[in-house]
Amino acid sequence: MSVIKKNIPAIGLCICAFFIHSAVGQQTVQGGVIHFRGAIVEPLCDISTHAENIDLTCLREGKKQMHRIDLRQASGLPQDIQSIATVRLHYLDAQKSLAVMNIEYR
């Protein structure tokens, strides 16, 4: 019995340390950083030119979609193109024989 009486303060100290450690371990985090990694899952569109038209062939949701852009009406792109990309045409000369096309994918 005398051994138990001598160890009561030590046991009490261990119990207090356990509860204090548990309370400190449950603190909430106010912020942080989450990192994502990934890849482009669909390839870029294939582009081919024909006289005054440009054909864009795109693979979307596993299916090939072809879109034809009339260069004479480049400002009025079809709606289905606008969901895939924004196409801008900038002519380098007044005769409109040299141009730069910028395709920005969404």
Swiss-Prot record:
Signal peptide: 1-25
Keyword line: Signal
Membership in a protein family: To the N-terminal of the FimA/PapA family of fimbria proteins.
Protein name: Uncharacterized protein YmdA
Organism from which the protein derives: Salmonella typhimurium (strain LT2 / SGSC1412 / ATCC 700720)
Gene that this polypeptide is encoded by: ymdA
